[in-house]
């Protein structure tokens, strides 16, 4: 049976992910929550620009309609 997108996201819970937003922003952090609208909650979040950390956050919520992609990071 084919994998569904939410299955991949669910397996990424409590793991580091990269979230790419429509306007080109990128955030990396530990995925601690999500919903069917792809609203995501990241802990230890960092804003990434040109491969470099430009700002560190604690816990953030990213609204799903801004999300272009969510990618599990390499372990």
Swiss-Prot record:
Signal peptide as annotated in the record: none
GO MF term set: RNA binding
Sm domain boundaries: 4-75
Keywords: Ribonucleoprotein
InterPro entries: Lsm6/sSmF, LSM_dom_sf, Sm, Sm_dom_euk/arc, snRNP_Sm-like_arc
GO biological process: mRNA splicing, via spliceosome
One GO cellular component term: ribonucleoprotein complex
Source taxon at top rank: Archaea
HAMAP family: Lsm_RuxX
NCBIfam families hit by this protein: PRK00737.1
UniProt family annotation: Belongs to the snRNP Sm proteins family.
Protein name: Putative snRNP Sm-like protein
